[in-house]
Amino acid sequence: VMAAGASRIIDRNDNPAEALGANAVDVVVDLVAGPSWPNLLDVIKRGGRYVTAGAIAGPIVELDLRTLYLKDLTLMGSTYQDKICFKNLITYIEKDEIKPIVAATFPLKEIGKAQEMFLKKNFVGKIVLTIPNDMV
């Protein structure tokens, strides 16, 4: 993650408010959610944004609505983008300007091992399955 440009990494099991302080960031991008979700809102500055595109730690979260309206936060789900966004993304990848972070690669026949790794949730990046040439 540091190689991708992060200036600091906080373990998802740590309290971000303790690590960063309250009202420390403008935007939180979260793919985890789960029980520690309210702690993420604590670090967002007034008028800030929270963006999610996943919930691997659990989709049900607790929200104190006062945090939402008193801090004037914007909560956003992100699973769909305009076609031009995807086209631009592909262009960046082809130009090697964006490099996906790959945690592990498994042949399709080892999908069970890939699933075991996914369920452990102790990796950074994507788990890739490769398809045999005779199946393409």
Regions inferred by a protein language model and the residue ranges of each:
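Terminal peptide-recognition signature
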Residues: V1, V28, L40, L75, ...
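Adenosine-nucleotide cofactor-binding segment
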Residues: V1-S36
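Short beta->alpha linker loops
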Residues: R12-N15, L31-V32, I56, Y80-I84, ...
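A general structural signal for well-ordered alpha-helical segments in protein cores
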Residues: V25, W37, L65, F86-I90, ...
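Short glycine/proline-centered loop/turn elements that form peptide/ligand docking sites
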Residues: G34-P38, G58-P59
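Conserved helix-to-beta-strand junction in the class I
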Residues: D42-I44
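Rossmann-fold dehydrogenase core element
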Residues: R46-A53, E62-A104
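C-terminal hydrophobic helical "lid"/dimerization subdomain
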Residues: K83-V136
